[in-house]
């Protein structure tokens, strides 16, 4: 099935969770925020299974000065 991650199509297996997708794509475990279908997903819900066509946005915290 296909999901969109930060405006790029990604092919994933059925039953793929948010956490598994993030791991597969190499995102760090800390310092990120995730939204699925325009709703921010707390880390406690990252084991949620993605639906076909889901839109995932990942924002990485950047420290600056």
What spans do the regions from the language model cover?
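Ubiquitin-like/PB1-type beta-grasp interaction modules and other compact soluble beta-rich domains
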Residues: 1-64
